[in-house]
Amino acid sequence: LNIWKGVVPFIILQLIGLGIVGFYPSLVNYLPARTYLTSNVAPPPMNPKLQYCLQEYKFAIYNNSENEIKNAINDFQKLVPTNLPVDKLDIFEEHFDNALGTFAIVQKLQKTEKEYELFAEDYRDLHFSVRKKQKKIRKIEDKIKKLKSEIRNLDKDDVSNKNKLELKIENYKLEITELTDEIPKTWKSQNKEFEILKKAKNTRTKRYRKNVDEAYDNLDQIALFIKDHEKLKNLSSEINDLKYSLNNKDYENSISIIDNLFEKLSEISGTDEFANKLDDLITVIDNDEIDEQKLSLASSETFILYDQEVSWREDANKNLLPQLMQYNEVIKNNIGLRLQSRLTKEQAKFVARCNSVHRDISLNF
């Protein structure tokens, strides 16, 4: 009796736990998922298993905060300096085009998703019924293959067994015919329409993800360009040495300086265009007969671009980077969410709750 006194409370607790699980089965999935998504080993938001729920999370933000996000994009766009090299201006413009275009893409995707869900309501039962019959047909076809294999292995004189097996095959074929006839005549047209809607939904989803990823990646690039302003400015001594060598027609030393610059530029972001100019310059001077006009043009373009790069980056570091960081705070948890290193606690809880609910994916098969 004394033993039971100690055990009873634990049994009651277990029964309560089972009762909770029975009433809230999603809780069994939610708690481990929340623990995992808030842990140090949590997957990044780019993880494929998180995409459905992250999209739900972001679309709610787009619907509720569209004006706030658009205003932030437009306000930051007004701050973009005018003294930008062409390639940097292209990156800024691409960012703003993608960021502002997000909302139209989302609306189209949501419209397509509604059309898909509406069609799927009536189509689901038909799909399940036909796939069940098709599965039976495949099983029967496998049986027929085995019987045909058995026939091939029989002795030529074993006519009796051969006839029995062929009779079984005929019966199976009749069964297949019956099952095929039970498939509604509308199946092919309905299935074709469903596949069109599914493809449209998947295409728009990919388009949306590509759009926001490119938008935020461009902003990341811009921030990195600005932060690397000191590294680029520190090349000024080599640039002056290059000017001096070119003016004195010391082309061998000029080539050596350019080679050294190439190595350093590989560690500085956003210098591809400048590296191309240096490459053009080295092409001109690495010749037996040097075209002075081409040399003058190539060197002028190279040094102008360097000064332009240093100038806009220094100016942006003082006057644009703080506003860029503020702007980033507005868009990083919606447009830029997929490219963050991890989920916030709020996001992790939402995704864990969303993923804990069973979703029917049978229509994909």
Where on the chain are the PLM-derived regions?
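Alpha-helical transmembrane segments of multi-pass membrane transport proteins
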Residues: 1-365
